[in-house]
Amino acid sequence: ILVPEKYGGSENSLTDAAVLYEELGRGPVPGPFFSSGILSVNILLQTANEKQKAEILPKIASGEYIVTPAITEPSYGWDKKYINLSIENNSLTGTKLFVQDGLSATHILCAVRSEKNKDSISIVFIDVNSEGIERKQLEGFLSASSEISFESVKITDDMILGDINTDQWDSLYTGILNSLPILCSYQVGGSQAVFDLSVEYSRTRKQFGQSIGRFQRVQDHIIEIVNHLDAARWTTYEALWKLESNMDSNTSIHLASAVSSEAYLKACDGGHTVHAGIGSLREYGLTLHTQMSRTLYHFLGDPKFHKRKIAKSLNF
């Protein structure tokens, strides 16, 4: 949806994408739609040269390529200092953790230390079927998070995006920032779905001869969900507006990310309190949101990470 027309995409706006992803979040619809169609596209637009864009983006738009970034490692963090995987003798050996949609991807955008300058970050475009790559699903209450291991994976200069002598960290980070409001929209959609489920259940579940929604304590939980939902929605809309209006949007994006991640998780907690036992049934659907909210809580930075970024931008 964000791929430019000259590369075979529809070149829609971020707001168009946000509307779509808010609806996908209501599902929540699984799959690499965000990882490949939003995040990877934005990273490629920032880091790849013209030849690489012309080769890769049309295949993402057509669905031939499913691409996902591999950034975090066992040291875990979303700042540059946490990237330790390094190109050595034109090969990679190491591990990337919490790679979203890593099992369904055909290619990965791997953030690594440059061989010539260890202070520099390079983005390497790697086919997952390359010799030396092993992928496995991470265990636990996670949605589509995987571990990717590299054992002497051969790296050539043409696999490195952009200028091989350029530090790509700032460009990578810009691609992430441009994608965050879309992720927030997905979380807003999920929070809205949890609210709708909770309100409907409070109307139809009877106890002591009346709907449980008449009890003040149940109303308190639903109001708390509403407060989180509204905070996430309006901070997300403001971030989108500022980003598309070419205003200074970094602080607003970090604020929306912190609020939306917290909102989705807290909305699910409140939803389970309203539903009680039935909410834990996989067939009911609430647990799908609960699992997704936990997965996305730390994806591209948890609320604590984004709050630190806000404080730094305010010179605290």
Kindly give the residue locations of the regions a language model identified.
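A short core secondary-structure module
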Residues: T93-I133
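Flexible, small-/acidic-enriched active-site or ligand-binding loops
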Residues: W78, Y82-I83, F98-V99, D127-D163
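A short, Trp-centered hydrophobic/proline-enriched beta-strand micro-motif
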Residues: S62-P74
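N-terminal glycine-rich flavin-associated loop
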Residues: V29-K51, D79
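Alpha-helical interface subdomain recognition
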Residues: I1-P28, T47-K51, K59, G63-E64, ...
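FAD-binding core of FAD-dependent oxidoreductases
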Residues: G31-V41, E64-V67, Q100-T106
